[in-house]
Amino acid sequence: MILDIHTHRPAPGAIVNVDPVDPVTLDRQYLYSVGLHPWNSDRVTPEALARLDTFAADPAVVAIGETGLDALRGAAIDFQQHLFDHHVELSESLRKPLIIHAVKTFPLVIAARRRHNPAMPWIIHGFRGK
């Protein structure tokens, strides 16, 4: 069995990634991960944070993320860390795994892991290619 746990294209049996920076709705025929991607961190609004919290608690959402830290794109790293910590807290309180994007920030991700000491799994999303 092959399971796609992270896709941006809805497909049967896949877990679809949703970023609540943009207004979206959850279609009940899919499972989801929901998170504020670091590339969009400079566009985060209070409404996007509220959507994140609401969506994260939905039973169709089975993972938190893609979230994380990116030294090359997005808002200042301090703000990204604030958002990342919020995602970690959601992951732990809702008992859902965390999907992480990390670019040139692995020491910060490791420090966050030590600081939070999470019980839920952390999944590093890796992508190489064009």
Q: What annotation goes with each model-predicted range?
A:
Residues 1-130:
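Mid-domain alpha/beta scaffold segments of enzyme catalytic cores
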